[in-house]
Amino acid sequence: MKDTNNISKLDSVVLLKSIPSKKVRRGDVGCVVEVHKPDIYEIEFVDENGNTKALVTLPGSDVMRLNLNIAATT
């Protein structure tokens, strides 16, 4: 199975559907901490203090990779 999302370990992703049992909502941003196989990801969601609020395994259809182009300032 080809990974059509091009999601890699440490990518930022946005959740496309709420998961009430895990206390994460559509629009929450998480970080991919592991790629188990193509299109299956372990994603960590943190609170405003940086504490883990959820660690969930999701298919690629439930998330979208964020393209964060942060320019360095001097």
Regions found by a protein language model. Give the residues of each.
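Basic/aromatic-rich interaction segments and small domains that mediate binding to polyanionic partners
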Residues: 2-3, 9-74
